[in-house]
Amino acid sequence: MELNQVTLPAHDVVASVAFYRSMGFELIVDAHHYARFKSLKGDATFSISACDPVAASSNTVLYFECADLDTQVRALQAIGMQFTQEPKDEPWFWREARLVDPSGNVICLYHAGVHRLNPPWRV
C-alpha cells in the first residue's frame, strides 16, 4: 500500500483553496464543499472538506518536504504568507518552518534529507 491522500477540515473552503493554490499546489477537484490538490512533485494528493470551524486544539499537521526549505519559505513570504515558525534546525535532524492555513490547520514545510526515512534511532 502507498499513502496517497489526507483530507483536512476547512471552515472556509474558498479561502483554503486560494491559500493552497498560492502555495503552488495544483487544484484538481473543485466543489463547493470539497477541493483536492496535487503535489507539484510526484502523484500525492491532499484535500480539504467543508466542516464547522476547526477546534483550536486540533493536532493536525500536514508536512511538505522541500529540497531547499529556506528558498521556498522566502518565496512564500514574498507573496505575503505569514509563518508562525521561521526555518529552524530541530533536534531530530529536520529543518522546519510552520504556517497555518485559513482553517487553523498547521502546515510544516521541512527538509529532512536521509533522516526522513533513516533517522539514527530507526528501529
Q: Can you name each region flagged by the protein language model?
A:
Residues V29-A31, S49-P53, D89, H111-H115:
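Acetyl-CoA-dependent GNAT
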